Amino acid sequence: MSTKDPNRLPHEKGFHISWDQIHRDSRALAWRLDGLGPDDGHWRAVVAITRGGMAPAMIVARELDIRTVDTISVKSYHSGGGKADQRREAEVLKSPDADIMGDGTGILIVDDLVDSGKTLELVRTLYPKAHFATVYAKPQGEPQVDTFITGVSQDTWIFFPWDMALQYVEPYRGTD
């Protein structure tokens, strides 16, 4: 029986995603979405939630041959790193083209992850008929997403490749 360490930070339960993995999972998302669009199975456009949704949205758009791509920028975290990353109310910093969006019908909105669901909840109020897809989903945010590939526990911190830097690490033994 395991016990939780009260001194362990939540992000210490990590799930590291490589570029290869996000590519495979984003392609799997595209395959799952193929044929689900309201226009004979096709989608009118892909909208990426920046910044995390940009890479998955690019891959989904390529796989489904969707040429109309836009972004919506929503800020719901203070990104100071570590303990400074605290949730706050979500706010839209940049909206997609209104002529494309309408009420969201035929629009595929893509993000890398749904965590608390606050970001998707805000975007869903703006585009209630859009289809919301994420590569990864945590239980608290799952009600806000229509399609996702992999579920992860709420206390898991996902390390995406665009957030990681390669750096030298000392070997366990010796330095020569």
From Swiss-Prot:
GO molecular function, one term: xanthine phosphoribosyltransferase activity
PROSITE patterns (UniProt xref): PUR_PYR_PR_TRANSFER (PS00103)
Domain of life according to the entry: Bacteria
Pfam families: Pribosyltran
Membrane topology designation: Peripheral membrane protein
UniProt-annotated location(s): Cell inner membrane
Family annotation (InterPro entries): PRibTrfase_dom, PRTase-like, Xanthine_Guanine_PRibTrfase
Residues bound to guanine: D115, I158
Reaction equations catalysed: GMP + diphosphate = guanine + 5-phospho-alpha-D-ribose 1-diphosphate; XMP + diphosphate = xanthine + 5-phospho-alpha-D-ribose 1-diphosphate; IMP + diphosphate = hypoxanthine + 5-phospho-alpha-D-ribose 1-diphosphate
Binding site for 5-phospho-alpha-D-ribose 1-diphosphate: R51, G52, R88, D111, D112, L113, V114, D115, S116, G117, K118, T119
Pathway: Purine metabolism; GMP biosynthesis via salvage pathway; GMP from guanine: step 1/1; Purine metabolism; XMP biosynthesis via salvage pathway; XMP from xanthine: step 1/1
Binding locations of GMP: R88, D115, S116, G117, K118, T119, W157, I158
Predominant place of localization: membrane
Keywords from the UniProt entry: Cell inner membrane, Cell membrane, Glycosyltransferase, Magnesium, Membrane, Metal-binding, Purine salvage, Transferase
The enzyme's E.C. designation: 2.4.2.-, 2.4.2.22
Binding of xanthine, residues: D115, I158
Cofactor: Mg(2+)
Residues holding Mg(2+): D112
First-tier enzyme category under EC: transferase
GO cellular component: plasma membrane
Single biological process term from Gene Ontology: GMP salvage
Subunit relationships: Homotetramer.
Assigned protein family: Belongs to the purine/pyrimidine phosphoribosyltransferase family. XGPT subfamily.
Purpose: Purine salvage pathway enzyme that catalyzes the transfer of the ribosyl-5-phosphate group from 5-phospho-alpha-D-ribose 1-diphosphate (PRPP) to the N9 position of the 6-oxopurines guanine and xanthine to form the corresponding ribonucleotides GMP (guanosine 5'-monophosphate) and XMP (xanthosine 5'-monophosphate), with the release of PPi. To a lesser extent, also acts on hypoxanthine.
Protein name: Xanthine-guanine phosphoribosyltransferase
